[in-house]
Amino acid sequence: MLAEAERGSRSGAANLAGVAIAGCVSSPRLSAELEVLLDERDALIAERDELIEGQTAQIAAMERRLAELGDEIEVRDHTIAQLEAQLGQLQAAVAELRQRLGKNSRNSSKPPSSDGLAKPPANNSKKKNKRSLRRRSGRKPGGQPGHEGARLERVEVPDDHVEHEPDCCEGCGGDLQGAERVEEGEESRQVFDLPEEIALRVIEHVAVCRCCEDCGTVSAGSFPEGVRAPVQYGPGVHALGVYLHVFQHIPYDRARQLIFDLTGADVSTASITAWVDQAARGLTEFDEQLRQLLCKEPVVNFDETGARIAGRLGWIHSASTDTLTRYTAHAKRGTEAMDNAGVLPDFEGVAVHDGYKPYQSYEQAIHALCSGHHLRELLAAEEQGQSWASAMSCLLLDSNEQVEQAKAAGLEALAADLLAELHACYRAVIALAYEQNPGLAANAHKRMKRTDAQNLLLRLDQREHEALRFAHDFRVPFTNNLAEQDIRMVKLQQKISGSWRTDEGAKRYMRVRSYISTARKQGQRPIDVLAQLASGRAWMPAPAPG
């Protein structure tokens, strides 16, 4: 449009110039020169127009390219943002994987068996041994002064007596047959051993019949309870089969083989299975009494662990004291299973546990957290660069030492000033921890992804009194080791004999295991109480003294 307007103005100017020249200039020479100048001017104008058109095209091309570059930049910015987000996710995933790979039995709740074979040697000067959670006691290894110990002691009346005669005279080599015996110089030694043959003892029960001399009625005696068949195994064999399978975790077939090798009794696996089922059915009253006793205890340790039951993940729950143990099996881990077990809903004492959240729903109970779990988690946090964790570990261990010293001195609680100092130091460590984790305190109430160390910090902050319950109440243990040791048998059972095929089978197993564990804690021999159970008279637990 501009070029056409310019060409129009140029032609108009040329016409006017021509008119002016025609009117004003009559010289042919001047007219020719003027025409030449006008042609040159026209050529310059054309060249200019051509340059303008070229530059206009270049500008349009550059504008299109700029638009394309803008689109490319926008796409690249979006791609960069996506890559940065993916990088952040990958970095978080790598950190989480490193954290998982760094967990072992020392800095988490993983069992020692999960550590694998890649363990550093105990004495390796090239590698610094990792810090142990235990502190030196200052005592020498072995038995301590005043410890009674345990050893074989001679008996007054041995079962057998074997005399060893000298072959000949040690002085001259003469025959000593019929020579005088000198008892003053004799020495005797006793050997405790199994009998050469462990055979079954067959007892024949006869129901004697008597005829009354007065009326002529024939009366028969009654067989003992449990003697029902013409030929059967007795309660001792029943007890041995149940003991081997339930307490020693031996599979049914291997238990059968062991009984045969020891006694010669060729029992079947079906018989042992039936004996375990019979034992569980006979413990209904025992289980209810055990539950009631646990509900009345001042302090009970609780724990739970996963197990393979009926081809899926199930859960074994335990409630333990120094004298009582109760196991229950359930498909769930949380409050549904705890309600079904029946102890926590009626328990008003101190519940010691690992801090699993469903325990907190039982508000009528007093709660205490396991310091052993805290020490392991603090060690993991320290390995992740959280220096406050080391200070908290030292504080917990020092507090436990003070409690043990106070117990040894016959005290029932720490002095008020020591408790005040303990809580002040505790809060100081928590404050240091928040300084090393900025922004955590402000967002503590929000549901967001946090590291294990941050979750531990929030738990220690929000549940301070539960974490330090052991310092206020000397009945409360420092750790939940009692429950962890009791429930460890679940892992042993799975390693040795495998999982439970049915839900009912797991429940029966746990009931019999509760019976054996409680009996052992109260000084009873498992074989004896199992034989008593097989005879139809279940042993009943006694409440804790005091």
Residue ranges of predicted features:
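Short, flexible loop/hinge motifs at secondary-structure junctions
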Residues: M1-A229, F302
